[in-house]
């Protein structure tokens, strides 16, 4: 049996149950474990309570319980520069970004990893539901978490081979109820703490109010694809392709009671396009273009791949053909797909393995670009 005590693992601890159990398992396996709390956002709420302070107290309590040293590190500047500025720029461009993908790439597995190495880390570990397996030649492959409902490889798809080489995901082989049970059996103070929801820097806040603090809203016309005026929208940034709620038009226009959906945006004219029916023609596409395409293992500069893909988190896989050229890709769908959204991640899979992914730039319907931005 190998002696893990000489291997230092620095754990990103958020104050939640997943990262608490991650630290616990590594400690039980004999590793030299250090807990780190990352403060990425100044999130004082309207009552003057900073939730990060409460979360850090939970980290301290758990670290003391399991007997590991802990530190707090401030990445607010890195987060603002590398994640939040990107988030705002994407909304300005009419797209719908996924900040969690960028946060993992730039903060949790870059800024945090760099910091952990200064502490002598051999590995970093997080509470993500994913798995890493190492080939005999040392190549690391990332697999989906065993808990299909919690699998987070979609958000980890931009990680590089170098980052994965230094990473452990101790929860990848567990289901969420098992993690809670382990926390309860160990008497961890976070055992019953509810999972955090929403974008990390918004949390439970009203998204519209939050965004309007940083980007001025520009109301404009809401129209059908064939030019019927449907009233006013509150600002293109508040709507995403395929969205149903928040349009304020219901079944009031015409006799058809089918629900209304956002089917497109014209950024230059500040028009929001809407249409009736979940599978409205304007929501369906047959291919997409992606940039910032990246694979977790070394791949040729140009190649074609038959695999499956996800276009949003918790979506079933769809069969695709991917034509890759440098960091760009054309992704052709075996079956038409609904509400492909510029700014979101497209992530590629071969069975259990997450191969990598990219960011969606445009959707196409039979060769014609969809008017999504």
From Swiss-Prot:
Belongs to the MnmA/TRMU family. GO terms for molecular function: ATP binding; tRNA binding; tRNA-uridine 2-sulfurtransferase activity. Keywords: ATP-binding, Cytoplasm, Disulfide bond, Nucleotide-binding, RNA-binding, Transferase, tRNA processing, tRNA-binding. Residues 150-152, 312-313 are annotated as: Interaction with tRNA. One of its GO terms (biological process) is tRNA wobble position uridine thiolation. It comes from Streptococcus pneumoniae (strain JJA). Its EC number is 2.8.1.13. This is tRNA-specific 2-thiouridylase MnmA.
């Amino acid at each position: 049996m190998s002696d893990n005590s000489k291997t230092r693992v620095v754990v990103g601890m958020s104050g939640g149950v997943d990262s608490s159990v991650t630290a616990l398992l590594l400690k039980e396996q004999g590793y030299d474990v250090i807990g780190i709390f990352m403060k990425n956002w100044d999130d004082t709420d309207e009552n003057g309570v900073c939730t990060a302070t409460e979360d850090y107290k939970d980290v301290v309590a758990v670290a003391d319980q399991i007997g590991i040293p802990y530190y707090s590190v401030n990445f607010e500047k890195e987060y603002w520069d590398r994640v939040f500025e990107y988030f705002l720029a994407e909304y300005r461009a009419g797209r719908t970004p996924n900040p969690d993908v960028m946060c993992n790439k730039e903060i949790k597995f870059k800024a945090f990893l760099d910091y952990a190495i200064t502490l002598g880390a051999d590995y970093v570990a997080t509470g993500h539901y994913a798995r890493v397996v190492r080939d005999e030649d040392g190549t690391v492959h990332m697999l989906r978490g065993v808990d299909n409902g919690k699998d987070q490889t979609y958000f980890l798809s931009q990680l590089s081979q170098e980052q994965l080489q230094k990473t452990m995901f101790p929860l990848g082989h567990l289901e969420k109820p098992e993690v809670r049970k382990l926390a309860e059996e160990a008497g961890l103070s976070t055992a019953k703490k509810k999972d955090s929801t929403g974008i990390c820097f918004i949390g439970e806040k009203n998204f519209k109010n939050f965004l309007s603090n940083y980007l001025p809203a520009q109301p404009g016309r809401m129209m059908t694809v064939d030019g019927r005026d449907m009233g006013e929208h509150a600002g293109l940034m508040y709507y995403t392709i395929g969205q149903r709620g928040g349009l304020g038009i219901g079944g009031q226009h015409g006799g058809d009671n089918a629900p209304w959906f956002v089917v497109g945006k014209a950024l230059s004219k500040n028009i929001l396009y809407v249409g009736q029916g979940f599978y409205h023609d304007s929501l369906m596409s047959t291919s997409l273009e992606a940039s910032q395409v990246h694979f977790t293992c070394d791949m040729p500069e140009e190649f074609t791949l038959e695999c499956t893909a996800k276009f949003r988190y918790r979506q079933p896989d769809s069969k695709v053909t991917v034509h890759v050229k440098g960091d760009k890709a054309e992704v052709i769908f075996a079956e038409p797909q609904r509400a492909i959204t510029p700014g979101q991640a497209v992530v590629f899979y071969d069975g259990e393995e997450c191969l990598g992914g990219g960011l969606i730039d445009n959707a196409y319907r039979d060769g014609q670009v969809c008017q999504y931005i």
